[in-house]
Regions:
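Membrane-embedded multi-pass helical conduit in multi-pass membrane proteins
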Residues: 36, 281-366
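Acidic donor-binding segment of Leloir-type glycosyltransferases
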Residues: 59-106
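Short, well-formed alpha-helical segments that are part of the catalytic scaffolds
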Residues: 26-32, 51-64
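Cell-envelope/extracellular polymer assembly enzymes that use nucleotide-activated donors
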Residues: 40-43, 71
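N-terminal membrane-anchoring/stem segments of glycan-assembly enzymes
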Residues: 1-38, 175, 187, 352
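Acidic donor-binding/catalytic loop of UDP-sugar-dependent glycosyltransferases
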Residues: 82, 131-148
């Protein structure tokens, strides 16, 4: 029975390894040498709530784009810090920049979706680029994105930024974003299969053809969804439009979180809502993560220390650990994260399991998902501001 269990777990890890290998070999990147054959007006749209720490560098890099035809619109989403003041400084410096004050958040809307909805109504461009207020852009971020949008024939192009990490916990936990994305979602099937479940997007960089954005209903169609980027990507495929996912490390980077507390809260905000508030789904994910990413490493320690394992069982455990580490090493090399962080995979996944439980606890305990001073209940209705 033990050998059968170990074989099933090894098979699951092998499938993840195959998916990761295919993705590493096939995922395209945004490249500086890519130039659009046409340069329609691009509206760069930035929702900003309490972003005084980062918005200045974001705007400074957007001001230096080599794409000549664009505007930048910032929406201050009722910030209570210096976000509006910092962003306002750019209005006098650059006529391409505009800032608007966000309306109060209405019932039934998640804050970011409402901010993006307001931005879309302010935009003048044929192309809409939604970016986060903590992204840093190379000079060719717009031109490479538009070129790839045109080349691919996509209606929505989303780029996965390079994650800038500094602290121990950032190095340990944030590479899991690549692991979850590239070891679970077969990217070729995103292009080839219409099934909307085979879709994802990264809200840090979403480049739309305006007509497609309006046709799927824009952010209003996902107004009560916490993980709006993924659900918009699903809508794109559901409505018969084309989705392209690219690695954007050379074009855009982001330092999402600066501490374990920020990572804990940021991921807790998304996981349970992203699973549709389904207790069976989160329980299954916890068990799967423990069985494939945590338990094998404890078993390997026991094999080494006690020797009380059959040869076959010991070999299966060693294969599980070796293959999982190989997956993480390959992803670290391809996506330019610290190699040593791969060795901390069981620690990272143990913490992630804790975050899954916390995300569920937030909602079931009656409080709700929390982000940027707002709390949402299980229907993503605003509870407190």
């Amino acid at each position: 029975m033990m050998v059968f269990y170990l074989s099933v777990v090894l098979a699951a890890i092998a499938v993840m390894g195959l998916i990761a290998l295919v993705n590493v070999l096939t995922v395209r990147s945004l490249m500086p040498q890519d130039h659009p054959w046409d340069r329609p007006l691009v509206s760069v749209l930035i929702p900003a709530r309490n972003e005084e720490r980062t918005i200045g560098i974001t705007l400074s890099t957007l001001a230096e784009q080599d794409y000549g035809n664009y505007e930048v619109v910032i929406l201050d989403d009722n910030s209570d810090d210096a976000t509006f003041a910092i962003a306002s400084q750019w209005i006098a410096r650059d006529r391409r920049f505009r800032i608007v004050k966000g309306s109060p958040l209405p019932e039934g809307w998640v804050g970011k979706s409402f901010a993006c909805h307001q931005l879309s109504r302010e935009a003048r461009g044929q192309i809409l680029l939604f970016v986060d207020a903590d992204t840093v852009h190379s000079r060719f971020s717009l031109s490479a994105g538009v070129a790839e949008l045109q080349r691919s024939g996509a209606d929505l192009l989303t780029a996965i930024p390079r994650q800038r990490t500094e602290s121990f916990w950032e190095h340990t936990l944030l590479p899991l974003l690549h692991f979850v994305t590239f070891a679970f979602l077969p990217m070729p099937l995103v292009r080839l299969v219409r099934d909307e479940r085979l879709a994802m997007a990264n809200g840090q960089y979403m480049l739309w053809k305006r007509a497609a954005y309006l046709a799927v209903g824009g952010h209003e169609a996902v107004k009560s969804v916490m993980v709006e980027d993924v659900w918009l990507a699903r809508l794109v495929k559901e409505k018969g439009f084309h989705l392209a996912i690219r690695y954007g490390a050379l074009a855009v980077s982001c330092r999402m979180y600066a501490s374990l507390a920020e990572i804990w809260d940021g991921f807790s905000k998304n996981i349970f809502p992203g699973l549709g508030y389904s207790i069976p789904a989160v329980a299954g994910l916890v068990l799967f993560s423990f069985a494939t990413s945590v338990l094998p490493f404890f078993m390997m320690i026991d094999v080494a220390m006690t020797g009380g394992w059959t040869t076959t069982a010991a070999e299966l455990v060693a294969a599980q650990v070796g293959l999982m580490l190989l997956i993480r090493f390959v992803l670290a090399i391809r996506f330019d994260t610290e190699i040593w962080s791969a060795l901390l995979h069981p620690l990272a996944m143990a913490v992630m399991i804790g975050i899954m439980v916390n995300s569920t606890r937030w909602v079931l305990a009656g409080g709700g998902s929390r982000w940027k001073g707002r709390v949402y209940n299980s229907r993503n209705q605003i509870v407190t501001h």
